[in-house]
């Protein structure tokens, strides 16, 4: 995977997620090795979607979001792994819980 693949994947996934989830998105953040710049050919593109919906409500969009992931994989060497996090949960945990803290401190904001 190259930086061009990462740029393509993050741009296309962000555009598609914004269309799918519309006004429910608070932030989209790329995190992990691609955000830090220490990715390799086996890395995936980790993306957190911070949303105003609870986990159960956002599940109804999984199929459309997975279609975006599949389209990206078919058109590049990038594999996107995403997670949807409720904004209240994210804000409560980003200061102390390791996973959320890494997203907050190492992440690259893609959409707000």
Give the residues covered by each predicted segment.
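Catalytic core of pol beta-like nucleotidyltransferases
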Residues: 1-27, 36-41, 52-112
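Recognition helix of helix-turn-helix/homeodomain-like DNA-binding domains
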Residues: 33
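Short beta-strand->loop micro-motif that forms the acidic, two-metal-ion catalytic signature
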Residues: 46-49
